[in-house]
Amino acid sequence: MLVYENLKNNNVLRHFKQRFAQLDTLLNNPIWVKSPVIELGLNKQHSADIRKTDSLYWAKTAHEQLAVNRHNGLEVTGQVYARPDAYFDSENDDAEKASKYKAKIQAELGWNIINSKFYQGKEKRNKVALANELSRLQGKKRQTADIYEKAADDLTEQYNFYIGTVIAHRLDNLDIMNEAYQFMLEKDRISNDKMLKVMNEKLAAEYDISILCSDRDISNKPIYRMKPSKVLVDTAALWRHIDEESIDARIMMVKEQIADNDSKLTNYLGTTRITPFARWSSYWQSNNKISNNGDVGVRFTIPIYNESPRKRKALETEKEIIKSSRNTDVKEIKQSVNILLKRIENLNQAIATEAYHIDQTSKYIDMRRFAYQNQKQGYNYLMRMDEYTGLLESMERMYKLMLNRGLAIINIEKAVSIYDNNNIFKEIEL
């Protein structure tokens, strides 16, 4: 806060004239800039991490599905054992000795059809793929969670620079007005209220600059003129994205597919064990001869209860729970998005109004400039400075409105899990 002492009228007027000339030059030669773009996307590190994670999940799925494809159900079992009692019983005749054996070797090749790729192989491969896809999507959601905050920070930082430069120019105006009011106060030509009002505005402007541009030098910057714009929203594409393409929707769809696939795998036949087999046995008989024999058959295990219908009903209920949860989530998201869309619409209107006000004020200042120059008896310098300050305030308000609109767009993109640049939002100049 500047406090002036021993002010002279000529010095105050000279400062006004210098500032008016400076403002006229700046306003007639502004630096036109486009509104900052929302850079909502994955940076190189994000993209590399996600590509690596995706490739690992796909490799894991390929290996696990290959394991399913190689599971042909063939099983080899064998046994080797001896019968010690054959050595101790020596009083039996030769026929009895021939019917006994000292040792036995047996090998069996069985085909466990139910627990193989030949029975519901497609569903078994799908189970592997869906489980990995669910884990991949959930991991991707975690990996992309911070891009919205980063996009909001980047957008805010860009706007803060332009807002800060406008405030800095307004602060220069307030410094001169403060100087004039102090001079007038010394001469008892003004009330304290007007001076206090300017001093409070100066304090507020200085505070805003310290918050918005604490790490930037915004002194002696040009006036940046931002072209006003309107944001159009493709609501049909937005609703379609919420229903089908958002990462949350895809996660819920995969969960539903998992429940549906598990329902197909749940059946009575899947709980049985049916194993055709071929067996070869060799006996070392008690008369020291070797005998062989082979046989074929079917070994089966059949539960006397059937819990599959209950499990399928449980899975169908789970599917309904998933659908209900998804519908509830979508409804809540759409309600939040509708509020943000209404906010964007209101901000579009406010920006258009402020842009019109800037245009009209600029024309007014141009007309008044010639009027002031032609007034030989002088004019109200404070009133003229108020006109310039009003224009700067209007520019500041418009930039803040455009920033708030950009943040509303990012909030929508966060709510519906858009994590890359898209064509849902289109910005056009007014």
Task: Indicate residue ranges for each PLM-predicted region.
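Charged, solvent-exposed structural "stalk/scaffold" segments
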Residues: 128-131, 135-210, 349-420
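A subset of solvent-exposed loop/turn segments in beta-rich extracellular surface proteins, enriched
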Residues: 8, 12-38, 81-138, 174-180, ...
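Outer-membrane pore/translocation modules
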Residues: 113-117, 121-124, 138, 142, ...
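Amphipathic alpha-helical coiled-coil segments and their boundaries
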Residues: 9, 39-49, 53, 121-128, ...
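Acidic, low-complexity, intrinsically disordered peripheral segments
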Residues: 1-42, 208, 215, 229-240, ...
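Intrinsically disordered, low-complexity segments enriched in Gly and acidic/Ser/Thr residues
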Residues: 249, 253-263, 269-271, 275-394
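A glycine-/polar-enriched beta->alpha junction
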Residues: 43-49, 55-77, 83-127, 140-144, ...
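Amphipathic alpha-helical coiled-coil scaffold segments and their short linker/junction regions
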Residues: 6, 28-73, 192, 216-278, ...
